[in-house]
Amino acid sequence: MQEKMEVQYMVVSFSHKNVDIATREKLSFSQEEIVPFLQEINVCDSIRESILLCTCNRVELYVSMIDKKRAREHIYECFCTHKNIALEDIKNIALMRLNQYAIYHIFSVASSLDSLVIGETQITGQLKLAYKLAFENALCAKDMTRLMHFAFKCAASVRKETDISAHSVSVASTAVRMAEQKLALCDKTLENLPVLVIGSGEMGRLACKHLQNANAQITLVSRTKENARKLALELDSSINIESWEHLEQLLGQYEVLFSATSAPNCIIQSKMVQVSQKQRWWFDLALPRDIENIQMENLHIFCVDDLEEIVQEHKNAREDSAKKAQKILERYSVEFFKWLQTLGIDPIIKHIRYLAKQSALKELDRAVKKGFLPASYQQNVEKILHGAFNTFLHQPTIRLKQASENPQGDPIIEAMKNVFDISDDVVMLNGYKCEKDTIF
């Protein structure tokens, strides 16, 4: 019998918790860079599958692998090569988690417990897109698919069983709240205040939405004007659309600005900004950052890491919900590993049920054709057979799963495959299915 290699999971993380924004900026990936990077990651024969998650708060690599030492060294070298950062620096700043700690972390990320703004729902969509990109480019398959399905189920349970995501929150909403606080110091509000929003992606959309709730007068600028028009139409508001070519002129007209583009370099440089007697508060929600580090009187520039004060207030308010959510994460982490242990037998059980189904339907069809059974009875007889086979297979299924959880269960699994003539190809095919089959 061929030696069975145990699949392990690893997370290599660079997030707002352990790396400052300047370093995250160096480590950030454009959409076009992700697939080539993951292809190089997967070259290592110790790594089976990989996903890269990039947001304004984190750059994280999720992999399934069989040799943690070789996988880790290869991953560090890939980051070093692609981002031109010294190997020792990568090793010093990377936060690595393995197996149950990796799983708990991924569930925490998906459920927004690890977010800068706890309870924000944007991260789940970002993780789904990261998984989709890797899957569609054949960079991940069953290992990560199983994990992602559990992660999204966990996130849904956290939202359903706690109020952690009540009163829609996000990095954008937190930035708008901070803008309100800064304006209040000057006896001003966002109501009827002209505000410039740069970028029509998800972060720009959220900024517009929360500014709209505050009754601000929004001007939207996007490199693609059509995208800005679509966003304005979606929000059904009186958002003013301006051309990208007018950006430099617009900068001198607004006290409050929110920028959230996916540009690879700064779009607002010091040479574009004029000195003003007015206080200005500009919020850079992008990574890499959109706004250069401009030192100018009356100009206050905030990046995502500067939202910490507001974020802490939010964390304190949701402490009870976070504790409940952590219990849910623990439950799902345990369930995931229990489920992984049964995967060796699950595909076999599915195929035995499939064989039972095919045999029953074949004989039933033959009985109807030969006139032994009226055709009008066929549907009800199918239901009876369904119940009979479920009852018959119930106890064997339990026993087989119990055997599969035992380290000595492999001979039993091999014997079942031999008795029912189940090939390894069939086991692998059924292993991709995350939900349990039924007979009918």
From Swiss-Prot:
The active site is at C56 (nucleophile). Its EC number is 1.2.1.70. Transmembrane segments: none annotated. It holds the Pfam family GlutR_dimer. It comes from the Bacteria. Coiled coil: none annotated. Keywords: NADP, Oxidoreductase, Porphyrin biosynthesis. Belongs to the glutamyl-tRNA reductase family. This is Glutamyl-tRNA reductase.
